[in-house]
Amino acid sequence: MKLNPDCIRDILITIEDNTGFGKSMSYELNSTYDLLQKYTFDEVRYHIDQCELSNLITKVHKFMDGSCLIQDLSPSGHQFLADIRSDNNWNKTKSIAKTVGTSSLTAIKEIATNVIAELIKAQFQ
């Protein structure tokens, strides 16, 4: 399956909105999270796995029926989401990724970090 950066972002936003101290997020076949409705169950589960492998989320408990329980975003996940939360920053990040011809999560995280760094630098000029 191809990595869909928009799906990753929507998953991270959904996890942030639905977790907290002592509160995990359950993702099941019939889940009704607004941002995830446009993706198939398999697509979301694949991208949850990619988020876990990339250390963006913590403690994913997987069950035999394909559902899972997610504890929270990791510190790295919070940082990445902070960098891409703004639609403007996200669209710029995706545009640069497309221009350079990459869709890897590592590259997208690096591009997002640089987009933010350039915005900060511009404030000092």
Enumerate the language-model features and the residues they cover.
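Generic structural signal for hydrophobic core residues of well-folded globular domains
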Residues: 15-18, 51, 81-84
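N-terminal intrinsically disordered, cationic/polar leader segments
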Residues: 29-32, 50, 111
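Non-catalytic, well-ordered alpha-helical scaffold segments
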Residues: 5-9, 45, 71, 75-78
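Short, amphipathic alpha-helical interaction segments positioned at domain boundaries
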Residues: 69-97
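Short amphipathic alpha-helical interface segments
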Residues: 2-34
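A short, conserved structural fragment
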Residues: 52-63
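Exposed, interaction-prone assembly regions rather than primary DNA-binding/catalytic cores
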Residues: 86-125
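Short amphipathic alpha-helical interaction segments
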Residues: 37-54, 68
